[in-house]
């Protein structure tokens, strides 16, 4: 039987003490947030494909900053994308509650999302557009 992907993520990031380790440790919780949002009836329907894209991005072995090459540090782009999508969801839903009720971590989710988005350049450099192109963001937005 295959383990749940969030459990595999936990194993992969546990014990990581390198650059951005505080954020890398949140990868499993952010992945779980995306999966739970899909089941939330308050998720604006037009955002479902974007949420699905953020989940798929986590699972893809060869993304913009691949884990295969960078180890756990390679999750920074996945984490950024989840934060970007989560922020879009809360803005479109018109409430933080949709994120709060689907969050499964001790760290408060809203400040975490804001911290990740404010750290964009430090986390992913100038790769935001490449990540958005990779998931087909423009097509998902139409």
Predicted features and spans:
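Membrane-inserting effector segments that mediate pore formation, membrane fusion
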Residues: 53-82
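Betabetaalpha-Me/HNH-type nuclease active-site subdomain
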Residues: 45-48, 56
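Terminal, membrane-proximal amphipathic helices
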Residues: 1-46, 87-142
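A generic alpha-helix surface/boundary motif
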Residues: 31-32, 49-50, 63
